[in-house]
């Protein structure tokens, strides 16, 4: 045995050095035990072709030693057993099949001797087109908030499990083996639910599948599988009917997409209701729907009236007829009528009759039709612009009494610089000037700070009052002083 494994491992190492193999597969093979490795190479022809350089049209078989394990094994006997390979053609394989059956029975007996009370289930996976089994997916419902997504995952997973059990009934003949398979193919909360729940082990594998499915629906979707099945079916049928009624086909080029949608929804309904929904399908087809409906009524049979594909085939044939008619009508436009009289097979029945002719009048190039020019509509309103002065224009500031704007002006009372007349500290000593200033301001005059450059005119004002003889004596004395009073402005 050890020598056999050593020989096979040498072949595997050679294939690794040549980079002609899958590294993961080689590592997995080398991690097997001696008996499992030799058995795997004996059962799978592809491994022997790939690593042991066998031809595809031959079958090789590695014969195990029939000696008892208590007897000592020598290296020479192992080498002779390894090199004694029975090579036979495919047509002469009766002896090889018998030896393979004996080998399988021996291997099964050894496994039962290791654990005589319970044998773990060994599933072969889902059958595929290539002949090899594909591993089923592991169910993990952790952190999936959508109940619809959970329902789809659970249904798909249970379909795969039921397919494995039905195709391998000998391996999964008890409910305990089915539960073990489900436990190994779940993760997270689904696996803990299978472990913690109490199951009836004495029931059949088919019933244990239904119980686990009911438990999954209750715990992870919140539905009673037995009671909600009818409600879910009614809801599904109602929704499909609404979608079929609302659907419409506007462009006949989208016939395939429309038919795909219609076929998906019609299969959600009951089978006996198919004919009336197919009639509705034909009525939704534009242009040729009426002709297709008439053909369907005349050509349908007891079986084809339930087929949506039969209705679509009629529609496609009508579309082909319509397209051919369009092509011929385009060709007839270019056909000359002069050839009809020459090539006519019927005798001439009209004599001296004028044929209706259509004259084409050419329009003179002098007169051309007047075409109004297109004008774009203004989407804005024209605003009246106001005059906005630029940076070189500014308003004239009003002049002040003191244009310089500072306290260097000369006082009008004391003729000193540094203060204004209203702040003059010498007002008491110049009361006469103050009176004249107040009187002039009341009359609307203002004193000038700068010297007057124009012609200066001086006016005098005399006040004459009618007095009595008694008062003339007093006024004569004061007349000298009053005559000298002059006001200059």
Swiss-Prot record:
This protein is called: Probable capsid protein
Motif Nuclear localization signal: where in chain: 107-110
Q: Where are the zinc fingers (CCHC-type)?
A: 409-426
Instruction: Report the superkingdom from the record.
Output: Viruses
Which GO biological process annotations does it have? Answer: symbiont entry into host cell; viral penetration into host nucleus
Organism field: Figwort mosaic virus (strain DxS) (FMV)
Q: Which GO terms describe its molecular function?
A: nucleic acid binding; structural molecule activity; zinc ion binding
What InterPro entries does the annotation carry?
Caulimo_coat, Znf_CCHC, Znf_CCHC_sf
State the UniProt keywords alphabetically: Capsid protein, Host nucleus, Metal-binding, T=7 icosahedral capsid protein, Viral penetration into host nucleus, Virion, Virus entry into host cell, Zinc, Zinc-finger
According to its UniProt record, which protein family does this protein belong to?
A: Belongs to the caulimoviridae capsid protein family.
What are the annotated GO cellular component locations? host cell; host cell nucleus; T=7 icosahedral viral capsid
Role, per record? Self assembles to form an icosahedral capsid, about 50 nm in diameter, nm, composed of 420 subunits of the viral capsid protein. The capsid encapsulates the genomic dsDNA. Following virus entry into host cell, provides nuclear import of the viral genome. Virus particles do not enter the nucleus, but dock at the nuclear membrane through the interaction with host importins.
């Amino acid at each position: 045995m050890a020598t056999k494994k050593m020989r096979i491992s040498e072949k595997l190492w050679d294939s690794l050095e040549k980079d002609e193999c899958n590294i993961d597969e080689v590592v997995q093979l080398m991690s097997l035990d001696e008996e499992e490795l030799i058995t795997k190479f004996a059962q799978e022809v592809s491994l022997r072709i790939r690593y042991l350089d066998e031809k595809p049209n031959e079958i090789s078989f590695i014969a195990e030693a029939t000696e008892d394990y208590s007897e000592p094994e020598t290296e020479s006997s192992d080498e002779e057993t390894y090199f004694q390979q029975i090579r036979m053609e495919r047509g002469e394989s009766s002896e090889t099949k018998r030896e393979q059956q004996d080998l399988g029975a021996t291997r099964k007996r050894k496994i039962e001797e290791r654990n005589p009370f319970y044998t773990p289930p060994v599933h072969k996976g889902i059958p595929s087109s290539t002949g090899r089994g594909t591993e089923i997916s592991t169910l993990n419902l952790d952190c999936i908030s959508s109940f619809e997504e959970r329902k789809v995952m659970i249904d798909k997973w249970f379909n795969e499990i039921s397919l494995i059990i039905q195709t391998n009934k000998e391996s999964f003949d008890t409910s305990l083996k089915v539960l073990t398979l489900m436990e190994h193919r779940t993760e997270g909360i689904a696996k803990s639910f299978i472990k913690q729940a109490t199951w009836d082990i004495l029931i059949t594998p088919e019933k244990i599948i239904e119980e686990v499915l009911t438990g999954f629906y209750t715990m992870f979707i919140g539905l009673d599988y037995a009671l909600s099945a009818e409600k879910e079916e009614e809801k599904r049928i109602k929704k499909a009917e609404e979608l079929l009624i609302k659907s419409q086909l506007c462009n006949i080029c989208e016939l395939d997409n429309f038919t795909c949608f219609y076929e998906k929804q019609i299969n959600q309904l009951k089978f006996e209701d198919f004919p009336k929904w197919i009639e509705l399908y034909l009525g939704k087809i534009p242009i040729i729907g009426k002709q297709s409906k008439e053909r369907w009524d005349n050509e349908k049979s007891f079986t084809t009236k339930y087929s949506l594909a039969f209705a679509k085939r009629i529609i496609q044939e009508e579309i082909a007829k319509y397209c051919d008619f369009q092509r011929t009508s385009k060709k007839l436009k270019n056909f000359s009528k002069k050839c009809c009289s020459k090539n006519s097979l019927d005798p001439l029945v009209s004599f001296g009759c004028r044929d209706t002719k259509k004259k084409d009048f050419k329009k003179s190039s002098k007169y051309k039709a007047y075409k109004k020019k297109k004008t774009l509509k203004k989407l804005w309103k024209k605003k009246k612009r106001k005059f906005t002065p630029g940076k070189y224009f500014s308003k004239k500031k009003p002049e002040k009494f003191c244009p310089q704007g500072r306290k260097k002006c000369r006082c009008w009372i004391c003729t000193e610089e540094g203060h204004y007349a209203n702040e003059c500290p010498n007002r008491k000593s110049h009361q006469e000037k103050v009176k004249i200033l107040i009187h002039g301001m009341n009359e609307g005059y203002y004193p000038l700070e700068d010297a007057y450059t124009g012609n200066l005119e001086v006016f005098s004002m005399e006040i004459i009052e009618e007095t009595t003889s008694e008062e003339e004596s007093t006024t004569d004395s004061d007349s000298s002083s009053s005559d000298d009073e002059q006001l200059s402005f």
